[in-house]
Amino acid sequence: MIAHGLPIYVALEPVDMRLGSERLGALVRDRMRAEPRSRALFVFVGKRGHSMKVLTWDGTGVIVVHKKLDAGRFELPCATQPGEQHLLVSDAMFDVIHKGVAITPRNARRRVH
């Protein structure tokens, strides 16, 4: 279903998962400065972190895929520049994100001397 080799843009700010294809498309235009009907995947995560929507266009229509984790949360990569609202990620990074795998170790602690 999700085609590999397409550009994958991940929104860094959480979105309301009640949004449908039209409103998600508007976010793609406004926040990502991209065209929703381009050959790309646009990834959005909900405020609680357990839901994800992927918007894409297959050449004949818009597709919205909604995934909800049974346990855990989707973890997004950090912005690389101040004020950045989205990131272009690799297929491998998208695989990590959409499976709900932690990007940063949760039990890592700083040592205090």
Question: For each predicted feature, which ranges?
Answer:
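Polybasic/polar functional segments that serve as interface/processing modules
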Residues: 1-113
